[in-house]
Design a protein with these regions (language model features):
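Rossmann-like adenosine-cofactor binding region
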Residues: 1-60
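C-terminal helix-to-coil terminal segments
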Residues: 51-113
């Protein structure tokens, strides 16, 4: 499964597709992903897993267009309190967004996280 989503397979995706990986960092050819994002073939991507982890500050993924990186937090939703807390935060943020109020845990783009 290493690089199962490679340049050839990304080319088969429709223009404007999105790629999401919450499984294994090795499943995606990251160089091919960067090229597909930068060329505009892919509209965006979200990665919760990357190679290496943690991702170095100067890694090319950090400069890729339309890429959302999360810090490997998509795991173990089977723990009751984790699931409940995530749902609670999502609902609160949805209500806050709809009402024009500040949301919890926003990314500070100036800081990069």
């Amino acid at each position: 499964t290493v690089n199962i989503l490679n340049a050839d397979r990304m080319a088969l995706l429709p223009k404007g597709a999105y790629v999401v990986n919450v499984g294994r960092g090795t499943a995606i050819d990251q160089d091919a992903l960067i090229k597909a994002l930068d060329s505009g073939h892919l509209a965006g991507a979200a990665l919760d897993v990357v190679v290496p982890e943690p991702l170095p500050a100067d890694h090319p993924l950090r400069k890729a267009k339309n890429l959302l990186l999360t810090p490997h937090v998509a795991g173990n939703m089977t723990l009751g309190y984790t699931c409940e807390r995530n749902v609670q935060l999502f609902c609160e943020n949805l209500e806050n967004y709809a009402a024009g109020r500040p949301m919890h845990h926003l990314v500070d783009r100036r800081k990069g996280y």
